[in-house]
Amino acid sequence: MGKRVSHNEGADRRPKKKAKNEKPEKETMESPAADVTVDFGSKSDATYVQSQVLSDMPQSEIDQFLATHSIKVTDTSDAPAVRPIISFSHLPSCDSKLYSSLSSFASPTPIQSATWPLLFAGRDVIGIAETGSGKTLAFGLPCLKKILDSGKIKFKNARPAAVIISPTRELAMQIYDQISKYAGSIGIKATCIFGGVKKDEQREALKSAAIVVATPGRLKDLQNDGSVDLGKVKYLVLDEADRMLDKGFEQDIKDIISSTPDSKRQTVMFTATWPPSVRDLAATFMTSAVTVTIGGDPSADPRANTRIKQTVEVVQSHDKEYRLVQLLSENQRGAAALDKVLVFCLYKKEAMRVERLLRNKNFKVAGIHGDLNQHERFKSLDAFKSGAATVLVATDVAARGLDIPSVKLVINVTFPLTVEDYVHRIGRTGRAGAEGRAITLFTETDKAQSGALINVLKAAKQEVPQELLKFGTTVKKKQHGAYGAFFKEADSGKSATKIVFDD
């Protein structure tokens, strides 16, 4: 028999103010001292049974796993602690068809290992991890198991059991593609809702969907016209929460959440960063949430994936496109001819010009930027994923969230507006444990970013070229000449402005 773990924190599980002598936050993931069986009260009926093999594992092995993968789990409640699910064999019992697709993976990723036991146990969870960390399956598997355990997998009247909110249509489609594979194997229907297409087919799909993956703007629209009722939602996910706030969707998110049942809802938030604006949002709708952090301090300076070899070349502005053609020619020949290369530009017009240039040079190229319609964007992404195009020219609309497998190289033709965007861009390579490469063409125009870039390079133990050091190591205030001090923490007391072009 395994250990049965769940939690009872009373009817009111809202965060409480810290008392003077309150004990400090505890880092969890040690094993409970004895078998514990407690129900969740009104919040959830979830019960998690920890595998006996996992329970018998020496604590030293658990500690080593947490340290090796830089996993920190912080829980301020008195709930029993649970151990990370290190192997798929440690998963709680469920329909074997749900787990069968996992055989293609060697083991859970760190974010999956740490969040699965908590989510299976019905806890509210905040996951802080880099993109490409396996978070879709981290929140997706517990979601599907929760629906299976409820005994109801057929739904009608547009009353879904689970809602997953994503900042962009591309990311929503990507999540849907992964979730639907697992859901379909056990007879659960999922649908994807986003802007830029007609609503009629979406309304029809909503009628029988158990899981809705959606962008906030379109979901809010369909709510307003009565096409979907969120009153039965028991599992709510906010993916890329920091990015949704950046894009001005805070009020839409709050409106959507307020229409779901607080007393029965399990809430999950995933974010790459942890600024005050995201913390404030979490505090308004999550109860006694456990925070799982993979890597360093998310509120500190941005850090690049250490598996990515970063190269910075200081060039003249007028030489950038010539150098880009050289780099592609050097990196797409012989055995590497089919390697996927992601090329980033700063503006739409620049991206369109670079795409035309590369096409004229006979590269197999596709593009993705804000001027393309829905069909054109999906067509470009599909071409790149399938290998029909080996070069994808993108603006920052593709910098975060998009899961494009096997990108070997990222080339930054123009440095982004912030070093955070730089880290997100190059994070398209070196995913799922693979090695990656990133080459950045840096010009005198970008010199205000030199100090921050040097810090990122040093933190990842990468070579810093002397030409870059000449621009200085001072970290400037986060602002851009054309946009001013646009990069400010969101004021949680003010309503955000919705940007509609990407939803």
Swiss-Prot record:
Record carries keyword Nucleotide-binding: yes
Family matches, as PROSITE patterns: DEAD_ATP_HELICASE, HELICASE_ATP_BIND_1, HELICASE_CTER
Residue stretches of biased makeup (Basic and acidic residues): 1-13
Phylogenetic placement of the source organism: Eukaryota, Fungi, Dikarya, Ascomycota, Pezizomycotina
Main location group: nucleus
SMART domains (UniProt xref): DEXDc (SM00487), HELICc (SM00490)
Residue ranges annotated for the Helicase ATP-binding domain, each copy included: 116-292
Segments carrying motif Q motif: 104-112
Span of the annotated motif DEAD box: 239-242
Annotated family: Belongs to the DEAD box helicase family. DDX5/DBP2 subfamily.
Amino acids binding ATP: 129-136
EC number: 3.6.4.13
Domain Helicase C-terminal: 323-472
Species name: Aspergillus clavatus (strain ATCC 1007 / CBS 513.65 / DSM 816 / NCTC 3887 / NRRL 1 / QM 1276 / 107)
GO molecular function list: ATP binding; ATP hydrolysis activity; RNA binding; RNA helicase activity
Example of a GO cellular component annotation carried by this entry: nucleolus
Protein name: ATP-dependent RNA helicase dbp3
Highest taxon of the lineage: Eukaryota
